[in-house]
Amino acid sequence: MTKRLTPQEKLSRKPASRACTFCHQKHLQCSNERPCKNCVKRNIADQCQDITRKRVKYLTGANSKAVAAATTPEATTTTPKRKQKRSVKGSPSISFPSSSISPINTSTFDTNGHPNGHPNDLLRQSLEASQAGQAQAPSLLEIQGPFPQMQTLQPTHTVASETSSSYSQVQPQHHPESSVPPSAPPESVDQLQQLMMHDSAYFNTNNVALNPTNVLEADPFDGHTNTMLNTTTDVLNKLLNDHYEIDNILQPPDDALLVDQQQSSSEATGTSASKAVPMGPSHSNTHFSSNYLNEEYLMLGDILLQSKPTSPSPSNTSASEYNMLSPSYTQNIDFDNIHLSKRKVVQKLKDSRPFISLGFPKDSSLSLDNLNNMAHQTDNLLDNNVSSRGNNNTSNQKLQSAIASKTSKTNPIINFATKYSTEYVSPLSTHQIYQTVSDIYSKDVLNYEYPNSYHALTHFLKTRFSGNNLPHEEKARKRQNLLVILKLIASYRPTFISAHKSLLKPQDLLFLEMSFQRCLIDYEKLSQLNSSPTIIWRRTGEIVSITDDLLSLLGYKLLDILSKRTFIMEIMYDDESIVKYFQLFKSVAVGNLHSSINTKVKLIKNGGAVPGGGTSNGKYNYNNNYNHNYSHNNNNNNNSNNSNNNGMSTGAGNSGDGDGLENNVGTNSYIEFCSVWTVKRDLFDIPMLIIGQFLPILPAGDGVRMY
């Protein structure tokens, strides 16, 4: 009985890389030294040898298994009877003693020693002779004379293994348990078929001479064990050895004759030629026997050869670390013809199966001339003529006539006369141009200049936080807030710039603007179905859409907001709301892909006073073209009328009559909202537009429940 090990011995012992034959059969813990401890303890140290590992089925053929089983001495000397019966079916190794060989008629063989008759004809003759009661075996079994090496029916060509240092020599061996008496007839038809299969295998493989040129090389995957973990390793090894496949593409292999002989021998022995994998470098065309591994190999080849990082996100900065090749592989690369090799491999992958190429081909047929046809085709396909914006009664007739004269339905998507135009187009104008989805594809697309928008934003921030006519302490505090905001903008804007540097100008920029207008139409339809007041603005902060109920709450008109460049920060009441906005936007601008923000914000009413001086009407007078002055009393009356028309709750104010109606929501200067911001990103994962929904916080009083 095996001695029980102590816990200390179990921790100190190390597993062996390969067990010996005895330990493998007895399921014992083997050691690395030879002879191992178990064999020394049992006095069988002379028989301690490494076990021959079982090879993976899809890396070797049935013919090579038969050769290995026939040339291994242990297969006929030390194996049990049960394993010998199993080896008879897969790898025949039956031999005859010299005393059982009788003269043979040489007329049945040609000059090269091959039988003239077909094995099936010989088998038919043997069956007829056995049925007639003849006492002798068929003439094919009576072998002597010019074939002395046929006394052992073993193939003469061998396969080089890991441990062999010289070519193996075939020696005649006698096995009494498998020999057949010379005068005994075959007992059954199965025995005759087995004997004939042995003889045909010998005659098909005997014509290969035993010399170094005909000895096959070792398979490069011979060291792998039969585990599922090695499938990925095999795929990567094949990817790193693509220069063998390039050689096979350029010229046929030198050992084509040897492969044909092996295939013919495998067909004669009854094995399927489709399952036999040729050994050596010429096996690259038959990748794997598994369709899953073939697909994995082809997909890895596509990724390694044609993929490239296209996003400036931090996750792609370390992609080059995984694309490095080992030094052993670079030694085998021909740097003179390296581009030719890559083209050969790519062409081989294209010929292997149809796939979608990762990246843009150099000979792309997509030109600017085809974009006109694409515009007409898209105009026919998109029949969404329902406008989500409608005609505004507040817009001027002159503005509509100017827009109608500037754009027409027959213009292409890209107008080369205006593609480099930097003229600013207000959101109200774009609402009149793109009223339906079909208008985006049929009318001229105007490019949006983000740098000019950032310059206007910087000018507004400097004006807002200038702190004129304020004490020194208040002015220093405003300047500190301005520095915080500028640092936040500088943290994410370089990423936006780097993402746009790789674009094809102006086509990609126009495509991004088309995507923006397409999403804007959908979100405006959604805001009409939603009861909450909504504002939609770009990533620069410029407002592009606002609902009527929010306009009525704040006392603005649509022309006041959308007829010029108006930022969301302009209608924020205090400096803390502006600083908090940039902090929240910086958190979702780069890296973090969260799409919603919950916060509180104070929005200025029309005509309300801003802390630190100034009013909301003039926006600090930084844009004098659209400076609208309204009196405070008129604003209050407009607020009350708009609130009554939209069904909002209003208060009677201090006086009980209807002369001085005021908006009872918020204060006279601002309204505090609970807001939810939804971030919509473009194809670079950069915020494209932000949808803000604002719910006013009602004041506490009689009839108002507080939570």
Swiss-Prot record:
- Where is this protein found? Nucleus
Which parts of the sequence belong to the PAS domain? 522-591
User: Which residues fall in a compositionally biased region of kind Low complexity?
Assistant: 66-79, 91-104, 178-188, 621-652
Disulfide pairs?
Answer: none
Where's the DNA-binding part? 20-48
What are the protein's GO molecular function terms?
Answer: DNA-binding transcription factor activity, RNA polymerase II-specific; RNA polymerase II transcription regulatory region sequence-specific DNA binding; zinc ion binding
Keyword Transport on this protein? no
The protein's matches in Gene3D superfamilies, at most eight in alphabetical order, are given as:
Zn(2)-C6 fungal-type DNA-binding domain (4.10.240.10)
Q: Which InterPro entries does the annotation name?
A: ERT1_acuK_gluconeogen_tf (IPR050335), PAS_13 (IPR056751), Zn2-C6_fun-type_DNA-bd_sf (IPR036864), Zn2Cys6_DnaBD (IPR001138)
Biased composition of type Polar residues is found at: 105-114, 154-172, 260-274
Give yes or no: UniProt keyword Nucleus.
yes
Q: Which residues form a coiled coil?
A: none
* Similarity comment: family membership: Belongs to the ERT1/acuK family.
Q: What protein name does the entry list?
A: Glucose starvation modulator protein 1
